[in-house]
């Protein structure tokens, strides 16, 4: 069954809703954005998350030191990296890497040393989908996440199209820029039923 990552969580209520509804991954955004949390906030929220639900730190062009500190402090089970990053440094930390790839026009470079790939819209967190016809995943040899404009209304179609390891949502479970408990529940139900 397709796994679910709920990203950009910053409140106890949203974390509780995601966990109780069956999320497999919880994403904490450390990159500068409206969803950014501090290490201290993430550490506090992480204490509410059972071991079976994996905690993912989301970064844009991080340094190795930033990753190591976050992995240890929160603690994180995986890191997700957007932007510039030397994947050879992955051997220097102890958790799996999710490498984000923005899908734009034309062929994207799908080769990566990361443990997972995450395919997203050109502007992550924008609520926009990418053109699903631009991405060919049949030849991929590693598990991948699909993100970008997913909602409870289109996630089943996405799963049928790609058969991904996991789907990732942030703005698709928000109302007026805030996580919406009912939308979180509906999204997870749409994937898991």
From Swiss-Prot:
Domain of life: Bacteria
Annotated Gene3D superfamilies: Aldolase class I
UniProt keyword annotation of Isomerase present: yes
Keyword annotations of the record: Amino-acid biosynthesis, Aromatic amino acid biosynthesis, Isomerase, Tryptophan biosynthesis
EC assignment: 5.3.1.24
Pathway terms, separated by semicolons: Amino-acid biosynthesis; L-tryptophan biosynthesis; L-tryptophan from chorismate: step 3/5
A Pfam family hit: PRAI
Reaction(s) catalysed (UniProt annotation): N-(5-phospho-beta-D-ribosyl)anthranilate = 1-(2-carboxyphenylamino)-1-deoxy-D-ribulose 5-phosphate
GO molecular function terms noted in the UniProt entry: phosphoribosylanthranilate isomerase activity
UniProt-listed GO biological process terms: L-tryptophan biosynthetic process
Recorded family membership: Belongs to the TrpF family.
Protein name (Swiss-Prot/TrEMBL): N-(5'-phosphoribosyl)anthranilate isomerase
Taxonomic source organism: Streptococcus mutans serotype c (strain ATCC 700610 / UA159)
